[in-house]
């Protein structure tokens, strides 16, 4: 129940929540003033708006509507007010200088904006001035920009100039916020400049430049003086939150100190207060900052002070609450207006933009009228209310939307009828809405419900005004049943709802009270029955069953409704009868009485005029008596004394007014009431009033041209109509004529007449006449007199005077006398008594006055605006006269823009043109040493030109130059003389002896000699080599490269050229001045290269089952890169199991080839490439083709077994070569002795591989064979088997054994179908190391009923030999299945073989292929500091790749992963390599500055060296020394750069930054500009200022602090590293102990003698291959990457007598990111994916060409030491082994990057004599190596068991490593580079391992270097090859077999080569020999190890083959650390191998 109630309430809230939301708003109510230029106009958007769209209107502040004035004012449809540009004569103050406001109105109400002051500003001519100032050295100077007061409000200072250069506020120059210029610490040179201010008009945008003012600086030492105020303030008024600057600056000597006081007290400590040289600055002003401020300046000779007042104005803010209100009629509304800000304000209230008038309903309360109260609100009170607060010029407002609606309650949610059990609580909910919120009451059967414990009510009001009431009945009884009614009431009305609630129990009827009904209304009578159930409720009246007429309705719940009750008809007894049983009823009666309500007859008020008698009766025509009649006016009781008399009778009441007046207007209501009801009737009384004058017209004066209002205001009802008439003339009016209303003359809303522009013709009488049809019309006349204000009628706008001559200015005025004429010059009134140069004469001329101003004589200062002002009592007018005084011009300011070798560029600025147009310029120049009599000149230069070039000068010469300017008045004085020096010239001769030599397919070497000495014109700085391709189709444009000069002969190599293309080359020399002529073009052709694109249109067509035709077309000629030699077709087969066949290739010169001998019905991949003399080109995309079908080969195997006495079962294997799709199998059965001529034939489906043949004869032999059938026909038959049926059927397996290969994570089925009688039992076992383990059935393994073993989601550990044994009473049978699980390939070994500026060449060696051919490689690379990797997909045959288009000088990260049919394998270690190049550097030998004058500097940036990478940008920053701010200049050119607008005679700091892709280089220097006269300035002197001590302290303290931090950081780092070393040592010991425990495990064949020691693998960087020098070994303790492990430390952890311990070999320069101490990342999981989970991901290992080395030191004292390059192979039992995980060599990089020890890998890694000699010298320093012998050998073991190893030669070895002839005698060379593209055996040498398809003879064809008597007994020709488990090999056999390439170099200090000690007999057959053995020579006396016993020739089929001695070379499953200690008894898995390189020290 409660849950239901909650959902009802929630739905109610959602359904009735109404958003009152304000639909009116202000876009911007802060607009309160708009000033605009008369020449521009203005557009003012309406600040108010509404949603939905509101009607926008504009009004004047007086409330008058505004109207459109064509071309003057217009209101757009969107509410925008536009004032158009206008001339001064069209100015109208009503339009252009008035207050406006805008309103927005929609259904929500109407709001108005604050008043907006709109003011137009005229474009007045004005001048700004700066006066000359005086100051002492070291003091302060203040310049002020003097702006005329008439425009001061609109004009502001925007900048200052010093000698036409804008002043940047810094150092000694400061610009105040109000436009003053302060110069502190005045220097002598400050007097050499002129200072100007620049102003800007805020509204017109017009700028003005002042005159140039000068500063006079006293030459003498400063004189002692008291302080004098230079700038101060008096009062400021600023808004809060802004910044203010109070100026206070004074001069004096000594410099005065400044102290500030506020209200007589020192300034408080506040960060907002800042004392500056310009004064006191206060930020974020607050009201409390207001006060009186005193600035005191004091020195030793006196003091001065200035006092000013600061007033902070807090802006007014108004908040009106509530913002929106929706309530009901009759409620009370309270609006509160809260203000913040200034306390002085006035509040006004508006409703819908009208001022609120206080009446009976509305009152305004509060001290400041801040509260508006509305009582008994009516519908008319709805609307928008605004609270306006005004203080002086500030106005703020806020508004609220009030919505009043009919508040009569209504039920919005209720309950329904229900039946409840006694004691079962229930709750009833009733929700009502109204305004004000109603109150809900409850009744049961028309009686109030008592409040007790059983009945509880709960009522609350929701946020939307809904009242919710609950009636909760906790334990209902029968009496609680009945009709429940909820009634909602408020002051407006009521509403109710009822429904029956039945409580189960015996029915009964409550006593019913008599009912009084109102006639004409509906009445409900409830039958107050309680209890439930009952059958029916019926009503009777006068024994008649109701209803008996249409006005009666009986509802199902027993309620009787009487509609339109009638007296008499509906009165009487009503009986309610309730049928409670079929024959039993109960009843109760009720009496109904009908009362008739009053009925008022209609009445109306007749039209009434003031003073009339009025009588209105109110008659009640019907209704039960008694009836009470009353009257009300406007809802209030009519009081006595109001002039209204009321007379009442029994059924009538009359209202009588003896004399009607205006106060009687209103709504009158007659109310009649009796016992039945109260009724009323309302009518309105309107009193008509004749017109009367409120304001009578009176005679008045109008001013010509101004607006005039003729006042006339009338009142009356209906509102009177006013008409204005006019009678011209000043005499008695004869006749009045109606005045036509125009745009100039209009009638205002108050009836007054508005004349917008009063004219003289408006003189006359005006009549105001009003009428409204009541009484007689009224009228009143008045006389208008027009007064003429003073007006200027004539004056010249502009005039010209000549300097030194007299000039007269005339001005004529008219208007009402007297007229006064005043002359002003600028803003100053001219007084001839004080200034004798001026004279004023005035005379009358009729109705005009003429005034003349005479200047005697005119000078330059008179070039201003003169104004004559005419003034009388009615106005003032002004005439502006611009006087221009002309004179000869000032000399121009000349500057040298650019000086070249043979020319110079001049620029000049004309300072003052003499107020006459400049007509030309003259330039004169001469040699510095000559007099001006020998000058050269250029005359009459056009005045429109401000710069010129002087040519034909001599390089490196000194010239003097000056200028004149002239106008029509005369010629100026000469300008200041400048001195310049010309520069060097570019070379005039080309380089000599240019030759070209092609170097590669993309490079040409260019050689040449310098130009002749006499043509160099300076020092040759470098050369530009231009080259272009001369082949057809090239654009013929030269590409330019640049290099520095190195001597008389030069060499340069052009790279990145097109291959096999002809190029033309030219060379040019350049010096500082430029580039000389180029040499003659010489041509050369680049060398050939391989084709860069494959052949096109490659097609393949299958001709027969073993023949296919491949065709193609020639690649594009442009991609051949040479002479095409032929084509090579590469193809390989794709087997059904997903593996690839052997790759083959065919070479041809034709464009078609026929491939024969292909496998039948086989998919082939085909690629075609073209080759040139340079090698093979790019292969084409792989093309797939399938050969056609042929007849199949014989089935691969056949079995036949007896299944009963008369039947046999034959099974077979599919053909090894099906040559097509097998359609069926045919089984042949023949009996040789039966005499049947033909065998019987049986056919089966292709998916059935066995068949039962029945009905055979017992004891008779039968011969069986099988043939497969394809679409090509029947194939070859299988081997024939003989069988005879037998009664006893022993267990036989008809399935076949063999090898099953599958990818991991797949389900595999191993079949073992058997026959026999009885049915055989099946048992599966799996071979382990020492026994066969039964296969258990679990979730992973399942044995089906037919004997099939199902392995689900196979893993690598599921690989192995599975044996199925079938057994019954008569025998058993066994098959063996070898399961090989393919896994993703192992990680490749990635190395860097070569780098260049834009490329990195990578090489790699693939890892274990996981049992599946490698399909390709994925190479990823990224920039070192980026994690965005790019992918490159590479063919599986590639072993190297060149990354091109890389950034120069950039580190790159590279990683590689291989992919096979299973998926992608482990990612290689991330290696890093850097392309060639470095950041730019600046050569100290280069001259940076080529020219410096007083304002410019020219820089030569050719001194920047690119570092091998092109420079992308050069940034120059410079500043005057001592300044903080830098000016910057950016360029991409390395040529010349100009620094302009420098200060003269100033030292500058310059810093440069040049950047390329490798980084940025920096360079800094200083330079000084020249003085204004061209002289140099002295060096910088160290002058200690205020901040010097702080700077020195900072300079000293910083290094100390940094050093202290560095020491502390070093201490922490060393402590951390020490902890890491200890942890690594513990890890090393733990690993050693673990290896000991593994080593102590027992095997099948225990090793005799001491076990081999564990090998500790420690990750350190790759360094030199041989031995560290003594100094390096001593530094092991300082290694920061790997802890040194000593013999003593290892002896504590392990038994020194039982195995060897590991010692790390270090290099002092180590990188720190080479991995942890024990790095297991190189442990190859082989085919075991589980083991990979414990190995770190390759992504976590990042090596900068680092390698892992392990030094295993045996405790046994032997002189032999072996350095092996692969720690995964078995090490020697005697000696120290250093292992290397990478297969390439490296040396320390020459790169100097910090933190990077990168290694440069070469394509071939070999040791030279020099390296061995150095190692020999190092060995002599070590006591342990005094008698050392160096042996260097190499050994290779294939990592594949492919068919390539069956050839018996090394030619087909895996191409990842190739053996080559040593480059030097005695040194075995190792090459890690991939095969070259043109290698003829490339197809054979590609490392694509083929899955093993072994037969017995596979191991007979192993290469010589794999065979060994120790493992295999040589088979005789008649003896089969011994069966050996696959993937087993002997280290000894490898060493023995691979002896031909082995070489030795013996370096013995004693010249006595010791041999190897002979092994003991006890260990000769069990101890593994050294990994590499030297060739038997005279120098080697060590005997060969004794051979091990031979293996048995033919082990039994059901036993495991073992060997006496063998070693695991490269396990694919077990740990490699385990492998090194495995000893004998471990079976080597197929395909394992090792690649290694070793160096042996004996």
From Swiss-Prot:
Domain of life, source organism: Eukaryota
UniProt region (Disordered), positions on chain: 1716-1742, 1781-1805, 1841-1865, 1940-2042
GO cellular component annotations of the record: plasma membrane; synapse
TM stretches of this protein: 1593-1613
Record membrane topology: Single-pass type I membrane protein
Location in or out of the cell: Cell membrane; Synapse
Protein name as annotated: Cell adhesion molecule DSCAML1
Source species taxonomy: Eukaryota, Metazoa, Chordata, Craniata, Vertebrata
């Amino acid at each position: 129940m409660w849950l239901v109630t909650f959902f009802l309430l929630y739905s109610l809230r959602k359904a009735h929540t109404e958003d009152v939301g304000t639909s009116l708003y202000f876009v911007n109510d802060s607009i309160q003033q708009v000033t605009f230029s008369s020449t521009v106009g203005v557009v003012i958007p309406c600040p108010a708006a509404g949603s939905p769209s509101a009607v926008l209107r504009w009004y004047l502040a007086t409330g008058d509507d505004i109207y459109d004035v064509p071309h003057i004012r217009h209101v757009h449809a969107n509410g925008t007010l536009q004032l158009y540009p206008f001339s001064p004569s069209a100015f109208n103050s009503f339009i252009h200088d008035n207050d406006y406001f805008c309103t927005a109105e929609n259904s929500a109400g109407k709001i108005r904006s604050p008043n907006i002051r709109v003011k137009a500003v005229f474009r007045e001519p004005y001048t700004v001035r700066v006066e000359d100032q005086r100051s002492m050295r070291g003091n302060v100077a203040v310049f002020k920009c003097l702006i005329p007061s008439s425009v001061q409000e609109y004009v502001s200072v925007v900048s200052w100039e010093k000698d036409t250069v804008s002043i940047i506020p810094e150092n000694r120059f400061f610009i105040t916020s109000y436009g003053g210029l302060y110069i502190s610490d005045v220097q002598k040179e400050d007097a050499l400049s002129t200072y100007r201010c620049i102003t800007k008009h805020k509204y017109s945008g017009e700028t003005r430049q002042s005159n140039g003012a000068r500063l006079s600086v006293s030459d003498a030492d400063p004189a002692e003086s008291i302080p004098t105020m230079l700038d101060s303030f008096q009062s400021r008024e600023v808004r809060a939150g802004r910044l203010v600057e109070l100026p206070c600056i004074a001069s004096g000597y000594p410099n005065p100190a400044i102290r500030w006081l506020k209200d007589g007290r020192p300034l408080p400590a506040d960060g907002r207060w800042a004392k500056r040289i310009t004064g006191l600055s206060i930020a974020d002003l607050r009201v409390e900052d207001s006060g009186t401020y005193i600035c005191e300046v004091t020195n030793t000779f006196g003091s001065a002070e200035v006092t000013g007042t600061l007033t902070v104005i807090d802006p007014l803010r108004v908040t009106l609450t509530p913002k929106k209100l929706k309530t009901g009629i009759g409620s009370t509304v309270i609006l509160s207006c809260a203000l913040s800000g200034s306390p002085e304000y006035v509040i006004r209230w508006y409703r819908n933009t009208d001022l609120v008038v206080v009446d009976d309903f509305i009152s305004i309360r509060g001290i400041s009228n801040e509260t508006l109260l509305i009582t008994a609100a009516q519908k008319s009170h709805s609307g928008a209310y605004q609270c306006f607060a005004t203080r002086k010029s500030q106005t703020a407002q806020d508004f609220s939307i009030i919505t009043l609606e009919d508040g009569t309650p209504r039920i919005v949610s209720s309950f329904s009828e229900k039946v409840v059990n006694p004691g079962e609580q229930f709750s009833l909910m009733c929700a009502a809405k109204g305004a004000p919120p109603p109150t809900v009451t409850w009744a049961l059967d028309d009686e109030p419900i008592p409040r007790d414990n059983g009945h509880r009510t709960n009522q609350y009001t929701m946020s939307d005004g809904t009242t919710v009431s609950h009636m909760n009945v906790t334990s209902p009884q029968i009496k609680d049943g009945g009709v429940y009614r909820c009634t909602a009431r408020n002051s407006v009305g009521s509403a109710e709802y009822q429904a029956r609630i039945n409580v189960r129990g015996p029915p009964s009827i409550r006593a019913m009270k008599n009912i009084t009904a109102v006639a004409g209304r509906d009445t409900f009578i409830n039958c107050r029955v309680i209890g439930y159930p009952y059958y029916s409720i019926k009503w009777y009246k006068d024994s008649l069953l109701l209803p008996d007429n249409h006005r009666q309705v009986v509802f199902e719940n027993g309620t009787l409704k009487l509609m339109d009750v009638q007296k008499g008809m509906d009165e009487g007894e009503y009986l309610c009868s309730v049928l409670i049983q079929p024959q039993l009823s109960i009843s109760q009666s009720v009496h109904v009485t009908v009362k008739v309500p009053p009925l008022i007859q209609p009445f109306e008020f007749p039209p009434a005029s003031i003073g009339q008698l009025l009588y209105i009766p109110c008659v009640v025509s019907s209704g039960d008596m008694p009836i009470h009649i009353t009257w009300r006016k406007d809802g209030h009781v009519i009081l006595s004394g109001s002039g209204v008399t009321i007379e009442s009778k029994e059924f009538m009441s009359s209202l009588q007014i003896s004399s009607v007046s205006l106060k009687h207007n209103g709504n009158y209501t007659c109310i009649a009431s009796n016992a039945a009801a109260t009724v009323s009737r309302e009518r309105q009384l309107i009193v008509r009033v004749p017109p009367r004058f409120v304001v009578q017209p009176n005679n008045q004066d109008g001013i010509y041209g101004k607006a005039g209002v003729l006042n006339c205001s009338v009142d009356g009802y209906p509102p009177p109509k006013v008409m204005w008439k006019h009678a011209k003339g000043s005499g008695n009016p004869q006749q009045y004529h109606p005045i036509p209303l125009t745009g100039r003359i209009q009638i205002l809303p108050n009836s007054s007449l508005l004349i917008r522009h009063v004219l003289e013709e408006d003189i006359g009488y005006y009549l105001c006449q009003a009428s409204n049809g009541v009484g007689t019309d009224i009228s009143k006349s008045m006389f208008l007199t027009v007064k003429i204000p003073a007006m200027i009628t004539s004056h010249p706008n502009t005039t010209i005077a000549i300097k030194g001559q007299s000039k007269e200015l005339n001005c004529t005025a008219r208007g009402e006398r007297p007229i006064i004429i005043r002359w002003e010059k600028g803003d100053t009134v001219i007084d001839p008594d004080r200034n004798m140069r001026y004279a004023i004469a005035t005379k009358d001329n009729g109705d005009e006055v003429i005034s003349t101003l005479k200047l005697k004589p005119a000078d330059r200062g008179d070039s201003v605006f003169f104004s004559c002002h005419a003034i009388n009592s009615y106005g003032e007018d002004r005439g502006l006269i611009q006087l221009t005084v002309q004179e000869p011009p000032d000399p121009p300011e000349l500057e040298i823009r650019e000086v070249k070798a043979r020319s110079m560029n001049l620029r000049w600025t004309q300072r003052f043109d003499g107020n006459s147009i400049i007509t030309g310029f003259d330039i004169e120049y001469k040699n510095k040493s000559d007099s001006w009599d020998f000058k050269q000149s250029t005359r009459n230069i056009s005045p429109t030109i401000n710069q010129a070039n002087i040519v034909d000068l001599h390089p490196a010469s000194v010239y003097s130059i000056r200028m004149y300017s002239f106008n029509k008045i005369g010629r100026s004085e000469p300008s200041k003389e400048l001195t310049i020096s010309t520069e060097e010239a570019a070379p005039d001769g080309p380089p000599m002896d240019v030759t070209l030599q092609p170097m590669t397919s993309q490079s040409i070497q260019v050689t040449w000699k310098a130009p002749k000495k006499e043509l160099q014109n300076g020092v040759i700085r470098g050369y530009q080599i231009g080259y272009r391709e001369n082949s057809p189709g090239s654009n013929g444009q030269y590409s330019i490269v640049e290099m520095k000069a190195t001597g008389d002969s030069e060499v340069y190599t052009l790279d990145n050229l097109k291959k096999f293309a002809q190029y033309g080359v030219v060379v040019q020399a350049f010096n500082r001045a430029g580039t000389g002529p180029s040499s003659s073009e010489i041509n050369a052709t680049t060398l050939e290269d391989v084709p860069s694109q494959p052949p096109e249109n490659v097609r393949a067509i299958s001709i027969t089952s073993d023949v296919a035709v491949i065709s193609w077309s020639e690649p594009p000629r442009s991609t051949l890169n040479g002479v095409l030699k032929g084509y090579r077709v590469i193809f390989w087969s794709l087997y059904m199991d997903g593996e690839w066949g052997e790759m083959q290739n065919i070479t041809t010169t034709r464009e078609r080839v026929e491939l024969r001998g292909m496998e039948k019905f086989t998919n082939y991949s085909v690629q075609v490439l073209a080759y040139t003399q340079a090698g093979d080109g790019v292969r084409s995309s792989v093309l797939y083709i399938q050969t056609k079908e042929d007849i199949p080969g014989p089935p691969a195997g056949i079995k036949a077994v007896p299944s009963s006495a008369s039947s046999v079962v034959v099974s077979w294997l599919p053909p090894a070569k099906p040559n097509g799709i097998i359609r069926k199998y045919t089984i042949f059965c023949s009996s040789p002795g039966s005499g049947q001529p033909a065998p019987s034939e049986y056919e089966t489906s292709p998916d059935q591989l066995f068949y039962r043949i029945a009905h055979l004869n017992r004891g008779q032999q039968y011969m069986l064979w099988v043939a497969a059938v394809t679409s090509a026909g029947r194939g070859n038959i299988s081997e024939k088997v003989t069988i005879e049926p037998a009664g006893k059927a022993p267990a036989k397996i008809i399935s076949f054994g063999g090898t099953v290969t599958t990818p991991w994570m797949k389900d595999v089925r191993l079949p073992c179908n058997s026959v026999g009688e009885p049915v055989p039992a099946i048992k599966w076992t799996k071979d382990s190391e020492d026994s066969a383990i039964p296969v258990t059935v679990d979730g992973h393994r399942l044995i089906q009923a037919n004997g099939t073993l199902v392995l689900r989601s196979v893993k690598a550990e599921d690989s192995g030999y599975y044996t199925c044994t079938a057994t019954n009473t008569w025998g058993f049978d066994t098959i063996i299945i070898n399961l090989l699980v393919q896994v993703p390939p192992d990680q490749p070994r990635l190395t860097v073989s070569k780098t260049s500026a834009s490329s990195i060449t990578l090489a790699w060696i693939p890892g274990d292929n996981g049992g599946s051919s490698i399909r390709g490689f994925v190479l990823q690379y990224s920039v070192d500091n980026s994690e965005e990797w790019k992918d490159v997909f590479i063919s599986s045959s590639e072993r190297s790749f060149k990354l091109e288009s890389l950034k120069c000088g950039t580190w790159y990260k590279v990683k590689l992963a291989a992919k096979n049919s299973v998926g992608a394998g482990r990612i290689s270690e991330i290696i890093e390599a850097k392309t060639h190049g470095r950041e730019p550097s600046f050569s100290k030998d280069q001259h940076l500055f080529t020219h410096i004058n007083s304002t410019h500097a020219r820089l030569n940036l050719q001194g920047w060296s690119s570092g091998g990478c092109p420079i992308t940008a050069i940034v120059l920053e410079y500043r005057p020394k001592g300044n903080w701010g830098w000016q910057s200049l950016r360029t991409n050119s390395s040529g010349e750069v100009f620094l302009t607008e420098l200060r003269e005679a100033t030292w500058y700091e310059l810093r440069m930054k040049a950047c390329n892709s490798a980084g940025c280089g920096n360079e800094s220097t200083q330079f000084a500009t020249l003085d204004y006269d061209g002289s140099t300035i002295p060096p910088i002197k160290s002058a200690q200022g205020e901040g010097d001590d702080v700077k020195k302290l900072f300079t000293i303290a910083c290094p100390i602090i940094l050093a202290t931090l560095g020491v502390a950081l070093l201490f922490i780092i060393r402590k951390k590293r020490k902890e890491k070393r200890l942890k690594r040592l513990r890890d090393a010991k733990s690993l050693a102990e673990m290896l000991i425990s593994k080593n102590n495990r027992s095997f099948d064949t225990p090793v005799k003698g001491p076990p081999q020691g564990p090998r500790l693998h420690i990750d350190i960087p790759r360094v030199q291959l041989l031995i560290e020098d003594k100094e390096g070994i001593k530094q092991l303790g300082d290694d920061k990457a790997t802890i040194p492990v000593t013999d003593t430390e290892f002896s504590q952890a392990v038994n020194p007598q039982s195995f060897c311990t590991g010692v790390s070999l270090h290099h002092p320069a180590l990188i720190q990111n080479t991995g942890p101490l024990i790095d297991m990342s190189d442990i190859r999981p082989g085919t075991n994916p589980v083991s990979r989970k414990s190995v770190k991901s390759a992504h976590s290992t990042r090596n900068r060409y680092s390698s892992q080395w392990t030094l295993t030191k045996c405790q046994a004292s032997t002189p032999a030491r072996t350095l092996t390059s692969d720690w995964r192979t078995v090490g020697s039992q005697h000696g120290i082994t250093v292992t290397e995980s990478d297969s390439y060599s490296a040396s320390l990089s020459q790169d100097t990057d910090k933190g990077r020890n990168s290694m440069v890998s070469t394509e071939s890694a070999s040791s030279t004599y020099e390296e061995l000699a150095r190692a020999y010298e190092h060995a002599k320093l070590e006591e342990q190596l005094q008698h050392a012998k160096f042996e260097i050998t190499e050994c290779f073991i294939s990592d594949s068991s492919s068919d390539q190893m069956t050839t018996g030669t090394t030619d087909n070895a895996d191409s990842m490593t190739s053996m080559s002839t040593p480059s030097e005698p005695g040194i075995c060379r190792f090459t890690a580079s991939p095969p070259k593209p043109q290698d003829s055996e490339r197809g054979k040498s590609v490392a694509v391992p083929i899955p093993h398809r072994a037969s017995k003879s596979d191991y007979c064809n192993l290469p010589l270097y794999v065979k060994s008597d120790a493992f295999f007994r040589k088979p005789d020709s008649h003896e089969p090859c011994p069966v050996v488990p696959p993937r087993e090999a002997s280290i000894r056999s490898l060493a023995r077999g691979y002896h031909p390439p082995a070489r030795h170099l013996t370096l013995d200090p004693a010249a006595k080569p010791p041999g190897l000690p002979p092994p003991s007999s006890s260990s000769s057959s069990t101890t593994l020999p050294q990994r590499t053995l030297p060739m038997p020579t005279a120098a080697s006396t060590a005997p060969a190890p004794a051979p091990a016993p031979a293996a048995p020739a033919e082990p039994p089929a059901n036993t495991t083959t073992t060997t006496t001695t063998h070693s695991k070379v490269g396990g694919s499953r077990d740990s490699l650390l385990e492998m090194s200690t495995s000893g004998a008894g471990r079976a080597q898995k197929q395909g394992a191998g090792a690649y290694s390189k070793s160096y042996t020290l004996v």
